[in-house]
Amino acid sequence: MKKIIALLLVSLMVCVPSISYCAPADIIFDIINREHSTNSSRAMELLYSFKKSAKANKDNKEPKDVKIIKNEKELNEANLQKGKIQGTLIGIDVSKWDGNINWKQVKGAGIQFAVIRAGYGYTRDKKFKRNIEGAIKNDIYIGIYWFSYAYTVDMAVKEAKVCADIIKPYKNEIDLPVYFDYEYDSVDYAHKQGKSITKVLTTNMADAFCSTITSYGYEAGIYTNLDFSNNYFGKSVLEKWQIWIAQWTRTNTYKKTDYSMWQYGAKSYVKGIKGYVDMDYFYGDKYEKKN
């Protein structure tokens, strides 16, 4: 597996002429007129779009612990820090619903990692091969997620095995965890099958999926949000595995356990992707502490 080098997030603000405020770091977008961007290194510049609604501008907030990389010299120095993530990376999570992604443009927009859906239930995501190979080609760090429709522990184990089989050709290119994604849609599906989903069952399924994934040599984690974690995941499993928390608010109020990734927005724009895309921060220091 290639080592994760220390790329620290560039936290920038872009002021758009004739617009009364500077765009916040909640949305990355391509600004066609390049003179509107800052003078930072093109390789690291983040181009932020703006929203007209003042309320919308408060949706997300960049983390306070982000270190600003001002030039290529600092970037090269950061790359030498023991092959570990030392700060905060900015990334996206994608699936077939994001269409045909231009990964070269995504990389150029400043995206440093992508969590790619490998599949759901027992089914491969139709865009998985295209997405992961595009990310690899453009030196974007890779994580995986699997949307679960399991309603027994055995089903969760089988999903993990199917996932491991699908991602096997790219094992050495996967830098971040493989995440178990279980949501209210998963619960609704189980109910339609006449199955009851309890907190104990969901906790056991998550643990079974993650344990199975780690047996194949991957790091494992759980995707969740504050409400779902309170209702369906026991604290023991949340403490055991890497946590990817979804909270589309200005600040993250999840305090149940440590988390190493935060999905902070779902209506963002990134050059190379048509329509909205989910945005994430990956906290390297927290990730290192939990391993």
Give the label of every model feature segment.
Residues 1-4, 8:
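Positively charged n-region of N-terminal signal peptides that target proteins for export
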Residues 8-16:
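Bacterial N-terminal signal peptides
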Residues 15-31:
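Sec-dependent signal peptide cleavage junction
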Residues 26-95, 236-291:
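Functionally critical loop-and-helix segments that line ligand-binding/catalytic clefts
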Residues 84-108, 112-208, 214-216:
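Substrate-binding cleft of extracellular glycoside hydrolase catalytic domains
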Residues 142, 219-220, 243:
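Hydrophobic anchor at the start of a short beta-strand
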Residues 164-186, 233-258:
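Structural recognition of alpha->loop->beta junctions
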Residues 213, 217-231:
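Aromatic-lined carbohydrate-recognition surfaces of secreted/lumenal glycan-active proteins
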